[in-house]
Amino acid sequence: MNKSSTKTLIALSMMAVSSGVSAHGYVSETNDGIAGSRAALCKFPTSDTQEKNRDCGAVQWEPQSVEGPEGFPEKGPADGQIAGAGLVQFSELNEQTADRWVKRPITAGAQTFEWTFTANHVTRTWKYYMTKQNWNPNAVLTRDSFDLTPFCELEYNMEKPPLYPNTFSHECIVPEREGYQVILAVWDVGDTAAAFYNVIDVKFDGNGGVVDPTWSQGGQINPTRDLNVGDRVFTRVFDTSGENASLSTELVIENETQGQANNWTHALATKINKEQQNIGAGQLNDKGEFSPQYGSNPVYLKAGSGLKSVEIGYQLETVEPVYHLDIEGLASEYTIGDSATELDLSLYATGDMNVELTVYNHGKEALANTNVTLKDGEAKSVVMALSKSEKGHHMLVSRIKNMDGELIKQDMSDFHLVEEAVTPPPSGDFDFVFPEGVKGYKAGTKVLAEDGNVYQCKEFPYSGYCVQWTETATNFAPGVGSDWSMAWDKVN
């Protein structure tokens, strides 16, 4: 039963611990986090059950970039687009049904939320919102889905949290709920007009939870891949003596439709329930009945059976090709000069592939793009000239496709453009920086010229040339004018 939530305002304490990933930030469960975000679980499997969200689109390559307008709930992403932060490229995150996403177990009370930051912006606050107990899990997320009073709000006084490979954790008091709920975590940064939106799919004990004590989860069927006709997928059952092959359930893929990831997982769970007495697969209700799902299916073991765990094995008819791209030569910083900034890169391919490289600035404006075809083992050099060079954070996005045009992998690397440090002019050995005070120059006057050198005005009668300068008549300009040597002597 839903109870009124308590809002927690906490002074932060940092726990910097080792992590692993690659440009902004997301809710993670790498170390001590209670649950990873929907976006994070599109890229990284859970640590215990190895579950992973599927069919996520582009966010599987960059869960750290779910960034939208700040100001939630008064402003921010529109209703129906909250999970994807209003970004078209992350629209898959906005899909919402009771069984669409992996759910992480949680209980009310003190819980640790963990963030991984790949660009550590200065921070105003973190805020956490929870869906109402009576929300509709089969309707897109709107403001009406949530209790708009954050149950946890944390100030950070415009400081920067620790950067990857460290994680950052803080504690919140989670209100009581039952069953499937969604937490919305909002990271409000202080150096842009944006915020990062991470929804977290969680499941509380209570209605919809496992209430039959005779069953405990011993494994998970995850829709990790599509299978081909003739491929085999099977359970590997372990008891106190090791693997028990006699309890294995095997499914042979008979057609292309059955080979789709969400379909074969449902079919395998159904077959397990028909063949096994001490193993069940799917959602377990309070009557002890299993309902196979089109997608992830928990695998349960009966108490007293002596069974310990279940793993999933594959026997594939075809060997999948290996693809890998190494990009060398990308610097962490480039100094802005008079000419266009250039990235001089070297590409090394494993597998035949088409590579698309795009450079974006922090505002996600494309500044350069190139396409390269590489054969297995081939290396090529690429020079990318940026259309404009402004200081700040930039990103190089690489997309690898096979020769059929199917996306294999997308990666993103960060770099920064910085302004060239201005060397202060030497002090104490000149009177003016030319052409300051030009009409007052006389014999012996020393000036710092445009070329960085110091010049001294000649003695009479040549000193009269030193004052003969305008923006359109520059022939006596020291060091650079066509007749400068008639008026000036170079000092250094």
From Swiss-Prot:
GO CC annotation: extracellular region
Keyword tags: Chitin-binding, Secreted, Signal
Record-annotated membrane-spanning stretches: none
Record's subcellular location: Secreted
UniProt cross-references to Pfam families, sorted A to Z: GbpA_2, GbpA_D3, LPMO_10
UniProt cross-references to InterPro entries, sorted A to Z: Cellulose/chitin-bd_N (IPR004302), GbpA_2 (IPR041029), GbpA_D3 (IPR054063), GlcNAc-bd_A (IPR020879), GlcNAc_Chitin_IntDeg (IPR051024), Ig_E-set (IPR014756)
Secretion signal span: 1-23
Domain annotation Chitin-binding type-3: ranges: 443-484
GO MF terms, alphabetically ordered: chitin binding
Residues covered by the Chitin-binding type-4 domain: 24-204
Superkingdom assignment: Bacteria
Main function: Probably interacts with GlcNAc residues. May promote attachment to both epithelial cell surfaces and chitin.
Matches recorded under PANTHER family: CHITIN-BINDING TYPE-4 DOMAIN-CONTAINING PROTEIN, GLCNAC-BINDING PROTEIN A
Family to which this protein belongs: Belongs to the GbpA family.
Protein name: GlcNAc-binding protein A
Organism: Aliivibrio fischeri (strain ATCC 700601 / ES114) (Vibrio fischeri)
